[in-house]
A protein has these predicted regions:
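Hydrophobic h-region of N-terminal signal peptides that target proteins for export
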Residues: 7-17
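Surface-exposed acidic/polar loop and edge beta-strand patches at domain peripheries
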Residues: 18-183, 189-348
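Positively charged n-region of N-terminal signal peptides that target proteins for export
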Residues: 1-4, 167
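Generic anion/oxyanion-binding catalytic loop in active/binding sites
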Residues: 6-7, 323
Length: 348
């Protein structure tokens, strides 16, 4: 976040005829460049772009520093076809990770799977289906308090074969005071005949380094975890855990998370922070409207300097939750549940 004095803010306002906050739509410009909604904070020099047609995801998050833009997301606004990790900030819902019958081994670490509901087996893509479907833009606005856009996903003929529930998921992106807040509201349909169950996450990917010329291995990471959930020799969660904390910042060169580290044991406001030694830091905080019992992964750390990205992967759930029953939010019909992410940058 940029910090300005009151007099400085007044002076900057007086020099500019433009309002501090704005929201603009940029139309699609052909294959690989979908339409996006851009939120702008002109005083803080921060912008965020949302792509409704691409899973309603965060497509870009950037800050102007010393006259140049610093983009924080890996493959920001890049939708060109091709293999490999796509980056950006896709929402993971109604599952995080692969889903497979308890006691079996998934065919791939993040491949398609299955889970049961009322005696019937349903398919479920890895990390759920929300990121693979177009979302509808509901509204956008800007005023003296900030700029915001709300996108929505509802049950449809495309979702019912893999998720037999009526639902509504709203994601409101709001830029205010240099901070981006993403509010997710999940609502169970009034026609459901049983509790709706889900986990949620975001596979947000930050590019390494933030500042051109930095050795990414010298960047540091910290988070308020106390434990790590362990995997067995077949790569699935074993049910065991060990103490693991990043409360003291660690250099990225000192660990490799190409095999994801499921981190748990957090307090009420879990956070993760990345710091570029050239004076740029980013802090990601999450907060849920209500909690569930442990085990509960809050950050699923993935990537590193060799990969060129780091994904803190904020979760509210656990891998294979739809089969194990752990880390599940359960909603009665007509009820709603909220989850919030906050992204704040600081530069000097």
């Amino acid at each position: 976040m940029r910090i300005f004095s009151a007099l400085g803010l007044v002076a900057m306002y007086s020099m500019s005829a433009q309002p501090r906050y704005a929201v603009d739509g940029e139309p699609a410009a052909g294959p690989g460049t979908p339409a996006v909604v851009v939120l702008r904070d002109r005083i803080a020099g921060v912008e965020a772009a949302v792509a409704p047609s691409e899973g309603g995801e965060l497509s870009s998050f950037r800050m102007k520093r010393k006259g140049e833009w610093i983009e924080f997301l890996y493959h920001a606004r890049d939708y060109s076809p091709g293999p490999g990790f796509k980056g950006k900030g896709p929402v993971l819902w109604p599952a995080v990770g692969a889903q497979y019958p308890v006691g079996t081994v998934p065919a791939a670490s993040c491949g398609p799977g299955t889970y049961p509901v009322a005696g019937k087996t349903y398919p479920m893509p890895c990390h759920g289906f929300a990121r693979n479907l177009p979302w509808k833009e509901l509204r956008r606005s800007a005023d003296a308090k900030g700029a915001r856009v709300t996108v929505q996903l509802r049950d449809s003929s495309e979702t019912l074969p893999s998720y037999p529930f009526a639902f509504q998921v709203d994601a409101t992106y709001e830029l205010s005071g240099g901070q981006l807040t993403i509010n997710y509201t999940v609502t169970a349909g009034a026609t459901n005949t049983s509790e709706m169950m889900f986990s949620i996450g975001n596979h947000i990917a930050f590019k390494l380094p933030f500042v051109t010329g930095t050795d990414p291995g010298k960047m540091t990471f910290e988070t308020s975890s106390t434990t790590q959930l362990l995997r067995n020799s077949q790569g699935v969660l074993s049910g065991e855990e060990k103490p693991r904390t990043f409360k003291t910042p660690e250099r990225l060169e000192d660990f490799d998370a190409r095999v994801a580290l499921p981190l748990a044991g957090y307090g009420s406001r879990p956070y993760a922070q990345l710091v570029d030694p050239q004076g740029v830091s980013l802090r990601l905080t999450q907060q849920a409207g209500s909690t569930v019992g442990e085990p509960l992964v809050r950050f699923n750390l993935y990537g590193g300097p060799k990969a060129g990205f780091l994904c803190p992967e904020p979760f509210f759930g656990v891998q294979n939750s739809l089969n194990s029953g752990h880390g599940l939010v359960r909603l009665a019909r007509g009820k709603e549940w909220n989850w919030r992410l906050e992204l704040r940058v600081d530069a000097h």
